[in-house]
């Protein structure tokens, strides 16, 4: 594990200078501070847990967690990562309170308010992309309650950090895969979760920008929202295929993959299909040859790392070295699944 001493030696500065930068104190030039932060990131530096334990035992932090609903099994995996880290942090006096909500503005605001009433000291949030959520985040931060977003982000808020995918990159990757599979010419249907979830819309943005710039013969026939619901996804995919007989490729930008694939199987058609995530039903369809490729984004790591960042800040007062903490994508096909 990297130490302050290691960072100091590589940066050519004193340990005290490194300590000031990592704890967000003044007295260091911007150029030196940036160099130290880059080295700390490259070494995957984490604050000393023994020191954090002593501080944590005095504070007894309570952290609120708001994730999207159980309709989307991907968030079960994010939650598993959060809960595994929560069990580890219980020894440091940390308690967690979790709420799972639908893609609904009022439901998410209500969940946050419930957690505030419980006296939370920090919030881990998969945000619904709406100005009211941005305002709520800013309200919490102004009250001294730090917020870390996980899996999906929200622009313009005072949230401290984000942990999750680079969704523009994910969309570009999907575009590249579809181009390889179709030789750059196809009629494409898109099923997404919700335009009010930033990660879904950013994936589509990354895909469409790449298609327009590099693969103009791939034409998007229609974009439909299934709200991460398998039954809705089944019905929408049936509708999409019936109304667009020339579609021979599909992109699922969010959940509802299994329902959509069942509709495709019943249609007797065999389009190229690119999806996201490695939930069990998606892997089943991948191994069966229905799905051509799926893009993984390490959900458990997202959950674990985001809670760890919040804990470290609450305990040491040091903000994360990086504001945006991206996990790596990996591509799964039938042969490596």
Positions of PLM-derived features:
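Short, solvent-exposed amphipathic alpha-helices that sit
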Residues: 74-89, 170-174, 198-218, 232, ...
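Hydrophobic alpha-helical segments within soluble ligand-binding/sensing domains
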Residues: 162-186, 233-234, 282, 298-315
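N-terminal helix-turn-helix DNA-binding module of bacterial transcription factors
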Residues: 1-53, 57
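Hydrophobic alpha-helical
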Residues: 123-139, 207, 225-282
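Flexible loop/hinge segments that line or gate small-molecule binding clefts
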Residues: 129-169, 279-287
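Hinge/cleft segment of the Venus flytrap/periplasmic-binding protein
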Residues: 195, 199, 211, 298-337
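Amphipathic helical "hinge" segments at domain boundaries
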Residues: 49-106, 110
């Amino acid at each position: 594990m990297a130490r302050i001493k290691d960072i100091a030696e590589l940066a050519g500065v004193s340990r005290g200078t490194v300590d000031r930068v990592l704890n967000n104190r003044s007295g260091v030039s911007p150029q030196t501070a940036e160099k130290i932060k880059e080295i700390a990131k490259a070494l995957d530096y984490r604050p000393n847990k023994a020191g954090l334990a002593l501080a944590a035992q005095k504070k007894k932090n309570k952290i609120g967690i708001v994730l999207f609903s159980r309709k989307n099994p991907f968030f079960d995996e994010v939650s598993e990562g959060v809960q595994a880290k929560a069990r580890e942090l219980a020894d440091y006096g940390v308690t967690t309170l979790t709420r799972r909500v639908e893609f609904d503005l009022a439901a998410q605001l209500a969940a946050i308010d419930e957690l505030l009433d419980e006296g939370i000291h920090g919030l881990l949030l998969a945000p619904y992309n709406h100005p009211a959520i941005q305002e709520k985040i800013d309200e919490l931060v102004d009250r001294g309650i730090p917020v870390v977003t996980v899996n999906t982000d929200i622009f313009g808020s005072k949230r401290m950090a984000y942990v999750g995918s680079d969704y523009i990159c994910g969309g570009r990757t999907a575009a590249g895969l579809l181009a390889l599979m179709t030789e750059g010419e196809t009629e494409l249907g898109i099923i997404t979760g919700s335009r009010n979830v930033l990660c879904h819309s950013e994936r589509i943005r990354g895909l469409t920008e790449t298609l327009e710039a590099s693969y103009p013969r791939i034409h998007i026939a229609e974009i439909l929202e299934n709200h991460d619901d398998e039954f809705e996804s089944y019905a929408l995919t049936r509708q999409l295929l019936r109304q667009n007989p020339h579609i021979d490729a599909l992109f699922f930008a969010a959940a509802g993959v299994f329902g959509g694939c069942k509709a495709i199987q019943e249609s007797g058609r065999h389009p190229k299909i690119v999806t996201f995530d490695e939930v069990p039903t998606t892997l089943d369809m991948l191994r069966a040859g229905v799905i051509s490729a799926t893009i993984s984004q390490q959900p458990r790591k997202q959950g674990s790392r985001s809670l760890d960042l919040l804990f470290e800040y609450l305990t040491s007062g040091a903000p994360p070295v990086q504001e945006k903490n991206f996990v790596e994508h990996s591509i799964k096909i039938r042969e490596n699944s």
